Amino acid sequence: MDMLLNPLNRRHRLRHDIPVVPGAFPLVGHLPAVVCDLPRLLRRAERTLGSHFWLDFGPAGHLMTSLDPDALALLRHKDVSSGLIEDIAPELFGGTLVAQDGIAHRQARDAIQAALLPKGLTLAGIGELFAPVIRARVQRWRERGDVTILRETGDLMLKLIFSLMGIPAQDLPGWHRKYRQLLQLIVAPPVDLPGLPLRRGRAARDWIDARLREFVRAAREHASRTGLINDMVSAFDRSDDALSDDVLVANIRLLLLGGHDTTASTMAWMVIELARQPGLWDALVEEAQRVGAVPTRHADLAQCPVAEALFRETLRVHPATPLLVRRALRELRIGQQRIPTGTDLCIPLLHFSTSALLHEAPDQFRLARWLQRTEPIRPVDMLQFGTGPHFCMGYHLVWLELVQFCIALALTMHEAGVRPRLLSGVEKGRRYYPTAHPSMTIRIGFS
């Protein structure tokens, strides 16, 4: 199938001596091809234009995209800013850690990160909270016999996040509805009229923020209680830096957003890979039987190397965050390419996670690259979680819940004598932007 490129825009041109990929449409640029066929678009651009080229992201403007491995160093560079993220999606990411650098980023991060480290998660009993929720969900899958996997993992992740926040069961439908409306801000056109996505998304964000402020007040009134939100508020209040509650609320909302879509996608891909590679399923079942129960503490995760390898290899082959954006604050060089001050940059993690320059046999889904390694995990192996000051604070939480999910799935299905099986094709319907996920229609059977 041809890529979704504009056949009337074939002119080759340069911006700052860097080629622009032909085929952009008016208003939306290259977004149709980025959303539906990003890997092929990057390969074609590299083959015809080289390692550096401009892609048109429509409302977000032109981003200089680099496939040179030296571009990864920009993620830690002091003269590269994350502020572009807020410029692209101010309604969602304004005031959050992902869009900040320097002192503001450090102050906010230091104020809340302790609750998300292994010790904080263990003290808050997060593993004990998640385990029965995960077991109940995969038990329902077994009883039903087949599921639309991405929809199910998305619902499970929302259930876990809402349980993390202590939202009462009777309030869950309202939160589900507002959360779905909040997500519209990711792609909302900049038109603020009643009934349109921008207006609905802003109203949902304000509704969610108001409830989060109520959680913060309740946490302060009951300071002796444990739980992730209580621990985050307690750590925030003990911080040496005088920060407003707006900072805390914005970053709890970020936890809600970041913990759902990308993790649900990874979870769905894990099930898909288990369904299409019987040997992986057999290895996971063997490990789950040996462990005997869903782990609840980070200290227990070392007993589950197969589940951990499945989590890491899935993230490598199917990165849920395919692109990172930054802005050059001064003139830089990537390899031999000069990058002018103020250039908006795109660093395609999707390309680097499957690059032969960085990984052996990159197109093969191989748990052995994790199970047989003797050296520590490298920063390049965890690109999905960022690097340097912007390393994802939710890393340990994601690691815990995905290993828990693997073990619960294997124990539950093996007990019934069934295994996951693909009931539909995988490649058609994949999406790559703003986050990547498998087709919404993929069905998995358990038989």
Curated annotation (Swiss-Prot):
GO MF terms here are: heme binding; iron ion binding; monooxygenase activity; oxidoreductase activity; oxidoreductase activity, acting on paired donors, with incorporation or reduction of molecular oxygen
Keywords, sorted A to Z: Heme, Iron, Metal-binding, Monooxygenase, Oxidoreductase
Please state what class of enzyme this protein is: oxidoreductase
Names of the cofactor(s): heme
- Binding, heme: 392
UniProt superkingdom: Bacteria
- Pfam families reported for this sequence: p450
- This enzyme's EC code(s): 1.14.14.-
Q: Which family does the UniProt entry place this protein in?
A: Belongs to the cytochrome P450 family.
The cross-references to PANTHER family, in alphabetical order and at most eight, read: CYTOCHROME P450 26, LANOSTEROL 14-ALPHA DEMETHYLASE
Q: What does this protein do?
A: Cytochromes P450 are a group of heme-thiolate monooxygenases. They oxidize a variety of structurally unrelated compounds, including steroids, fatty acids, and xenobiotics.
Q: What is this protein called?
A: Cytochrome P450 BJ-4
Q: Which organism is it from?
A: Bradyrhizobium diazoefficiens (strain JCM 10833 / BCRC 13528 / IAM 13628 / NBRC 14792 / USDA 110)
Q: What is the lineage of its organism?
A: Bacteria, Pseudomonadati, Pseudomonadota, Alphaproteobacteria, Hyphomicrobiales
